[in-house]
Amino acid sequence: MSVPTTQKAVVFESNGGPLLYKDIPVPTPKPNEILINVKYSGVCHTDLHAWKGDWPLDTKLPLVGGHEGAGVVVGIGSNVTGWELGDYAGIKWLNGSCLNCEFCQHSDEPNCAKADLSGYTHDGSFQQYATADAVQAARLPKGTDLAQAAPILCAGITVYKALKTAQIQPGNWVCISGAGGGLGSLAIQYAKAMGFRVIAIDGGEEKGEFVKSLGAEAYVDFTVSKDIVKDIQTATDGGPHAAINVSVSEKAIAQSCQYVRSTGTVVLVGLPAGAKVVAPVFDAVVKSISIRGSYVGNRADSAEAIDFFTRGLIKCPIKVVGLSELPKVYELMEAGKVIGRYVVDTSK
């Protein structure tokens, strides 16, 4: 396959600095990597955090962000087996790990101290050609709608892992905060596909209609509710069995520790800058609730999440714009005006 020497990408040279749409060199895959012609990339809140430098973990600089890239294999490193030119492949948040530490050996590769992160420590998918470790790259069936598949590679895998972490049973209630956003809209669908009943939290009538169209049985609008804890417990006959916090709201996390039912599980996914978990210790003990963090899935979780999608059980509510419009997407994200998931077309 013919691969150019230069490509279009969005790059920033300092955290919070200008987002530059410009020509950069096409990377050469290392012996353990594949080169992917990225057709589409989802835009995640993590990308916004990486650009702004919100987290206590330094990014590489300059940096090409993005970690939900779907495309075609156009280059293969000298030590790679099992991949062929023309295969469909996905770039995930976890670009690579050591595969030798205790975490990697127990299938907890995302917790590897040497993890290489797409769009954070490794140039990501906001470019036309990107590299990925051949072991961690996601396999996508030929014929997959790559624009639709892109958000599955982080948002889908992340919420699927969070729902597994909750350890609840079919027929149980799960509450999803930030349900109208990119992660939340997928969390509703995965929850329904796994047999759970969904109550959604977000703001505004438009998002209420949206989440119900995805399968939420109940909706609580935090902008009008006078007592969210009471409203949720009433709607779920005593409180949900689990709460999945995908919103970037410290207050929402604190509320979930109150409304979850006894023996329920609060799962932390969203990462509000500088936020802390505040929970009444007496209630947490007497109700025997669990508070668990859920990061991203391992290779098995990823394959399972993709399988739900390829079987038609998950529909990604996306809006496709050109890669050059990425700064505008960030503005919408900061204003809380994103419904569903934005996907960028790297050819525009």
Curated annotation (Swiss-Prot):
Subunit relationships: Homotetramer.
Domain of life: Eukaryota
Compartment(s) of residence: Cytoplasm
Gene name tied to this protein: ADH1
Cofactor(s) required for function per UniProt: Zn(2+)
Record function comment: Converts ethanol to acetaldehyde and plays a major role in xylose fermentation.
Catalytic activity: a primary alcohol + NAD(+) = an aldehyde + NADH + H(+); a secondary alcohol + NAD(+) = a ketone + NADH + H(+)
Alphabetized InterPro entries for the sequence: ADH-like_C (IPR013149), ADH-like_N (IPR013154), ADH_Zn_CS (IPR002328), GroES-like_sf (IPR011032), NAD(P)-bd_dom_sf (IPR036291), PKS_ER (IPR020843)
GO molecular function: alcohol dehydrogenase (NAD+) activity; zinc ion binding
Stated name of the protein: Alcohol dehydrogenase 1
Top EC class of this enzyme: oxidoreductase
Annotated binding of NAD(+), by residue: 178-184, 202, 207, 269-271, 341
Ligand binding (Zn(2+) 2): 98, 101, 104, 112
Keyword Metal-binding appears in the UniProt entry: yes
Entry binding sites for Zn(2+) 1: 44, 67, 154
